[in-house]
């Protein structure tokens, strides 16, 4: 799912329909989120998610902003793409 809050909604919808997400669940439904929401370990089943390194993302954003401010509008190349490693938090939902 796009984020953990959407994945939590998917867990609730699955439960309403009698589905049991997870490796041991019926029907082969596995649900995972993205952003390691603090409540993810406490859902039923516990939500699998990908944790983001928010400190690295924040540092990169501030560095880029400072670079832009010091460039007097002379930065070329347009937007930059920077990838960050995530950490899989494998739990019961997947």
Regions found by a protein language model. Name each.
Residues 1-94:
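Flexible loop/turn connectors
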């Amino acid at each position: 799912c796009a984020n953990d809050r959407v994945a939590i909604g998917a867990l609730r919808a699955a439960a309403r329909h009698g589905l049991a997400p997870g490796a041991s669940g019926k029907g082969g439904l596995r649900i995972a989120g993205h952003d390691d929401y603090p409540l993810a370990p406490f859902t039923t089943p516990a939500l699998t998610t990908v944790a983001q390194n928010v400190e690295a993302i924040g540092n990169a954003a501030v560095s880029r902003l400072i670079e832009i401010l010091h460039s007097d509008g002379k930065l070329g190349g347009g937007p930059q793409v920077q990838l960050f490693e995530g950490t899989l938090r494998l739990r019961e939902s997947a």
